[in-house]
Structure formats: C-alpha cells, structure tokens
C-alpha cells in the first residue's frame, strides 16, 4: 500500500527508522524502548500522528528538542 507503513510485530527502533525516512530532521529511539514490539498500519503522510499514537499505546514519551530532532524514550511514572 502506497503511503502506508504496515508493521507486524516490528521492533520500535525499526519502525522509527522507517518513519525517519519520511520526516524532515531525525527521529531517534532510546535503547531502553528499542525492543518494544509494534503492530499496526500507519499513514506516512502524518508522522506526528504516528508518534502521538505510539505515545498513547506504548509506555513511551516523545521528546521534541525541535521539530527536526525527536527522540522516543521510556515514559516516566
């Protein structure tokens, strides 16, 4: 499917590496959450929405140093 990323039990680090290709700047994954598993379909034309969805469904936070430098880290309690 064009414009859609389909993930089936994909490592979070691998999903974010793929998202990084479709977004200006950089998306990085902290080692503490890199091996979390992700499944779903994600629209590549809205990477912010993907990051929001990950934050809502996984124990992660999304830290924006700027619009162009994003890191996904373990959620704080």
Tell what function each PLM region has.
Residues 1-77:
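A residue-level detector for the "anchor" residue at the start of short, highly conserved motifs
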């Amino acid at each position: 499917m064009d414009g859609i990323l389909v993930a089936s039990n994909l490592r979070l680090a691998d999903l974010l590496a793929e998202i990084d290709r479709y977004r200006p700047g950089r998306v990085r994954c902290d080692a503490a959450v890199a091996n979390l598993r992700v499944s779903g379909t994600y629209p590549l034309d809205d990477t912010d929405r993907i990051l929001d969805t990950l934050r809502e469904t996984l124990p992660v936070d999304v830290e924006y140093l700027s619009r162009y430098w994003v890191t996904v880290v373990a959620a704080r309690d």
